[in-house]
Regions:
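Short acidic DE-rich linear segments
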Residues: 1-3, 135-140
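Long amphipathic alpha-helical coiled-coil segments
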Residues: 66, 71-74, 105-137
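Extended, charged low-complexity scaffolding/tethering segments
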Residues: 1-27
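Amphipathic alpha-helical coiled-coil segments
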Residues: 51-61, 98-121
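Extended, amphipathic alpha-helical coiled-coil scaffold segments used for oligomerization/tethering
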Residues: 63-106
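Short, charge-rich amphipathic alpha-helices with coiled-coil/heptad character
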Residues: 19-52
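Short, well-structured hydrophobic secondary-structure segments
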Residues: 39-74
Length: 140
């Protein structure tokens, strides 16, 4: 995979993170108004479920990427095993590592996105607790 494709993936994931950050900040701002709490509750729950769906999708993509890396590792190992020059194990590993660098970079981007999405779900869970506490204070 070329650097342009990796850069495009990074930009797409970054845009997704920015969009979710804006959404979560908007939800946090809506916690200030007790009169619109019903809408806020629905939006928090809806956003949380959408994030969970995206986590599932990213998990599938990570599994696919790991499968691709494993297959390419096997192919590269066989190629360097049958190489014209005798290579030591460390040399083979270095060559294979270089061959798989782009695939590993993609995997790293996907895993970082997964971690970020999981943290965002935790943030929305905490908002749910904040809503509950806010409503409990109102009833006092």
């Amino acid at each position: 995979m070329s650097n342009e494709k990796i850069l495009a993936l990074d930009q797409k994931l970054s845009a997704q993170r920015q969009e979710w950050s804006t959404t979560i900040r908007g939800l946090a701002q809506s916690l200030r108004n007790i009169n619109t709490m019903e809408i806020t509750i629905a939006d928090v729950l809806s956003s949380r479920q959408t994030l969970v769906d995206q986590i599932a999708y990213i998990n599938v993509k990570i599994k696919q990427q790991k499968k691709t890396i494993s297959a390419r590792y096997r192919e590269a190992y066989i190629r360097y095993y049958e190489y014209d020059y005798k290579l030591g194990e460390k040399q083979k590993e270095k060559f294979i590592e270089n061959d798989l660098a782009d695939d590993n970079m993609i995997l790293s981007h996907l895993e970082n996105q997964l971690d970020w999405l999981k943290d965002s779900v935790k943030t929305l869970d905490n908002m749910g607790f904040a809503i509950r506490n806010r409503l409990a204070l109102k009833d006092l």
